[in-house]
Amino acid sequence: MRVVGGRLKGRNMASPSSRDIRPTADRLRESLFNILIHAYDDPIADARVLDLFAGTGALGIEAISRGAAFALFVDNGTEARALLRNNVEALGLGGVTKVYRRDAADLGPAHPIEPFSLVFLDPPYRMKLAEKALASLRDGGWLTPGALLVVEEAKAAEFVVPDGFEELERRVYDDTEFVLLRAVTAS
């Protein structure tokens, strides 16, 4: 697994040893970031990024590599947080990232954390955790008005967009679906 674009392009990231963590494949990550940059006026530059169900941190690290100002990684798994810390340290990203142990589907209030303009959600497939996490983001004040969110889910999961979000598009790659959303109410 490697960083596919930006200033860290080509740098390796630690991969999980267990099947409990499912990082976004390099090819899919590259496609997703091309969509964000070319179809959504590059929401990455100087963004505050939130990477929920972060696993290895590949999505947030990719955003930092491409110009995001800050990334917060949230995962409650012990192996995931160890991988995250390893990747952050190996890539020299300690000053622009934080790793939180928290349930991404039950975040609570964001205060005193500043809200985020770009959010990645890559929950375990077919567990309906994305919908819960989106409601938690909305209700807890984690999002800037108009924040862009990307949900990665199994195509077969039949993801339903909760209130407070506008569906912008869906892209399917094999058995994976990216759903791009916009926060429509200030949180």
Task: Explain the meaning of each model-derived region.
Residues 1-187:
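Class I S-adenosyl-L-methionine-dependent methyltransferase catalytic core
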